[in-house]
């Protein structure tokens, strides 16, 4: 379908988690009459059950709306929804590249938050026109003037005529549409130049194969044409193209300036990478669009089936999830304690939790997940350097020259009352203070350099609980730094449990070890014999707790009488327990593995 380009508007909606981004998208869809109120399921763009339940957008979607504006022209609005969570920053940056404008939602009750700011910087990097919108004005605690002041002071945008809306109640939605029509620039692009298009999303369809969402910058895509993916150099033939509106609507072509989907019998999402450039096989462009990067996992953890024979089912399930999620990686690994399993790589903690939940929900699998870890660079004395994802493979202390760990630059926005507790939390997590800026008399931004290893465990939860949910966090990886790290091993009944091994900083080793053994003592059920729970560094035990045994009262039948008879029975019982301990095995429940992650809750 061809439109006059001057009536096309490509925009996305950016916001902090929970500021009402998907709800506003729904109201825009309703207002333009694409779906009736009856057809609307809450959050149309969030199609995964999990997305709706957690109220977050994980994968982004693109949808075409037709809006008749007050000037009586019909405008074509391409709305590209973006995930707001820090784990998915790369996906946000790609979808912004497909737009000319961004609607920035600011919550009237909370003002500008850390990830709002993070996303604004991404939009500024892409030279987008930013249109602020104040949402949630229906709430009793809404303060529109406060939100306007924050938009002007913190982001530096003029907030005089900013639309104030309630996406939930559908108040003032037309103002947002008019704002988009007036202020978002029309796309530029030449249909006669060679094809140049950006992939900003892809998903797997069981009938069509991989469906790729693209923004065409130059040229056009038609069924039958042969296209080339520039990062992988693979070619495919286009079988269908079109756009998403109330459903998938196929068209004759997608031309320069427009957004749509392309089907070309691709079997694996890895061949259609987000951020890649598509061009014509017979008439390619010289260089791809800039900004493409291979997404690399930041957090790793082991996933094991609770029942050993389910290993293949878990692997198949992960393969199916990977088809839709190019950022998920996995490889086989074995553990003495848990048997066969898979070492999986994720973008961050939220990404990890979502994959684990989907394994449970969509595939009904019972899994055990080990503590997450990051990639360490170990420089050995013989001059070699190795990368360690699994703490079990950490070399002996005698072989190590020095170790480097990944560090992040964290930005925390918080009300001024909580500055003290946040600084205390960051110092406790081995943070280095960088800078503190007062945004106004009530709010402050604190910048810290933190080891990623500390952020992935429970930093986010601790931050939220210490600040009653008011603080918000944004972080980015800045590189590797030297650190005194050691391997802490946990022994249960004198046997090392490799799945509980973690890498800790030397100064925190004793404290962590104490907390972990105390946690495990509470989580592991009592057996018929005494179970020692120990934490060791190398051959040195640094902490121990004992799980007491159940005891049968062997003296119940003895009334009075000779002490030697009682002693004999007790000795016999002791002997039996000793024998039992040497042959008995200890069942470690999944809760015990999880408790290691939440070691900070003990204090």
Curated annotation (Swiss-Prot):
Pfam families, per the entry: EFG_C, GTP_EFTU, GTP_EFTU_D2, LepA_C
UniProt keyword terms in alphabetical order: Cell membrane, GTP-binding, Hydrolase, Membrane, Nucleotide-binding, Protein biosynthesis
Catalytic activity: GTP + H2O = GDP + phosphate + H(+)
UniProt-annotated location(s): Cell membrane
Record membrane topology: Peripheral membrane protein
Positions of the tr-type G domain: 6-188
Entry binding sites for GTP: 18-23, 135-138
Main location, first listed in the record: membrane
PANTHER family: TRANSLATION FACTOR GUF1 HOMOLOG, CHLOROPLASTIC, TRANSLATION FACTOR GUF1-RELATED
Protein name from the UniProt record: Elongation factor 4
Lineage: Bacteria, Bacillati, Bacillota, Tissierellia, Tissierellales
